[in-house]
Each structure stands twice: as structure tokens, then as C-alpha cells.
């Protein structure tokens, strides 16, 4: 019986840890903290297109 209780507690702790890590990853993505590589890809796809460049001037600032 003790072994079963130990397994249940271990499983609950593992599940709580796994779901917390997954939700933290989703929160980072939802809050707009995109990696630089994604930002560069969006900019590189948008800036050559005149319509996209006009609608999103913040992405294609002239330097």
C-alpha cells in the first residue's frame, strides 16, 4: 500500500512540474516575447512587399 501511495504522489508531482513548464512556455509566447529570429523572418518577408511595408512602417525603418 505504501508503494502505491508513493507512486501516486510521484506521478502527481511529475504532472504538476510538466504542466507548469508548458504553461510558462505558452505565456512567454503569448506575451509577445518572440525570438529575434522570428522577428527577422517577419521583417525580411514584409519589407520587400510595398503593401506590407506601407502597413507596417515600424518593421521597415530606413537606416
Swiss-Prot record:
Transmembrane segments: none annotated. Residues 22-43 form a propeptide. Pfam families: Toxin_8. It is found in: Secreted. Expressed by the salivary gland. Keywords: Acetylcholine receptor inhibiting toxin, Disulfide bond, Ion channel impairing toxin, Neurotoxin, Postsynaptic neurotoxin, Secreted, Signal, Toxin. Its main location: secreted. Residues 48-50 are annotated as: Lacks the Ser-Xaa-Pro motif that is crucial for potent interaction with nAChR. InterPro entries: Conotoxin_a-typ (IPR009958). GO terms for molecular function: acetylcholine receptor inhibitor activity; ion channel regulator activity; toxin activity. GO terms for cellular component: extracellular region; host cell postsynaptic membrane. Residues 1-21 form the signal peptide. It comes from the Eukaryota. Disulfide bonds join 46-52, 47-60. Alpha-conopeptides-like may act on postsynaptic membranes, they bind to the nicotinic acetylcholine receptors (nAChR) and thus inhibit them. Has possibly a distinct nAChR binding mode from other alpha-conotoxins, due to a different three residue motif (lacks the Ser-Xaa-Pro motif). Belongs to the conotoxin A superfamily. The cysteine framework is I (CC-C-C). Alpha4/7 pattern. This is Alpha-conotoxin-like PuSG1.1.
Amino acid at each position: 500500500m505504501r508503494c502505491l501511495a508513493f507512486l501516486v504522489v510521484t506521478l502527481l508531482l511529475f504532472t504538476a512540474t510538466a504542466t507548469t513548464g508548458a504553461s510558462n512556455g505558452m505565456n512567454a509566447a503569448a506575451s509577445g516575447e518572440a525570438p529575434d529570429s522570428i522577428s527577422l523572418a517577419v521583417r525580411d518577408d514584409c519589407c520587400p512587399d510595398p503593401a506590407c511595408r506601407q502597413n507596417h512602417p515600424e518593421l521597415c525603418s530606413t537606416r
